[in-house]
Amino acid sequence: MLRAVIAGLVLASFTLSASAETIRIAIGTQDTTINCAAGGLLIRELGLLEKYLPHDGAYKNASYDVQWKNFTSGAPLTNEMVAGKLDFGAMADFPGAFNGVAFETAGKHSLFISVLSGSIKGSGNGIVVPSASGVQSLSELKGKTISVPFASTAHGMLLRAVAAQGWDPLKDVNIIAQPPEVAGSALQAGKIDAHADFVPFAELFPSRGFARKIYDGAQANAPTFHGALVDQAYAKKHPEIVVAYLRASIEANQLLAAEPEKYSELIAKVTGVDAEVNYLFHGPLGVQTRDLSWKPEYRQA
């Protein structure tokens, strides 16, 4: 009898502990990649995730540890997702493909759950040169040094553009890895001949006067998009939290659509990216289509 009572107390203690658990929600964002705003920055700054998190049923006694970590590109974000340090992540098509491969290599899986923004033609990516450069077109960059964030959507665009010129990317151009925050200084110092990048840098650098765009991603006529991914094991364990994240993302997108000027200013305050450049992407005639719907053309990305 005593053993039965003790067993019952242990079981009750375990059940109480399980129902009162603290659930981690770790989200990797790319704040300066402003077309990811509806999947990260705005959700965080406006407290939208907390608005939709479940507090009934299995989550009645749960508490949440919401963690945010910002990155400047998708590759390092993927590394932390695979290592189990992040549950959600926002990134573009090319790094998203690497994300899937990296998860499978580790014996796990990630799930693509939502588009955040994109262009079926490839707008948003681009190649810029220093403003004082005499280079006027991509064809003049043969034998030159072009930097690009490694494994980014801009990297994919650059490889397509080089192939379209009939060049060997290992012999005819010197492609080096360089994140946007370093590339800006390198362009101003004349340390590189050109830089390929994703949203918003192909517009931001020329806007600030130290670079000039010579190639727009739309010239590659290959779609590009940014979206959100989640660790599959996490999604299976906490599907209601994935739904909460998606609902928060939908509201963030609706707010952007309703008041693009207001939220372009907020994004500028958080990231330092000029509000006018933010509006180029989030305004009603934006460079990209900012919505959460999947388009068949995105499969080509």
Task: Give the location of each predicted region.
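Bacterial N-terminal signal peptides that target proteins for export
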Residues: M1-I6
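Short, glycine-/small- and polar/acidic-enriched structural segments
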Residues: E21-D168, N174-A177, D193, A222
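N-terminal signal peptide c-region/cleavage motif recognized by signal peptidases
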Residues: S13-S17
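Secondary-structure end/capping motifs
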Residues: T33-I34, K237-A301
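Sec-exported extracytoplasmic/periplasmic mature domains
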Residues: P54, V82-L86, V101, A163-W167, ...
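Short, hydrophobic alpha-helical packing/hinge segments within bilobed ligand-binding/sensory domains
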Residues: P76-T78, L86, P95, A183-A186, ...
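Periplasmic-binding protein-like
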Residues: S114-V129, P206-A235, L246-S249, G283-Q288
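Cleavable N-terminal signal peptides
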Residues: A7-G8, A18
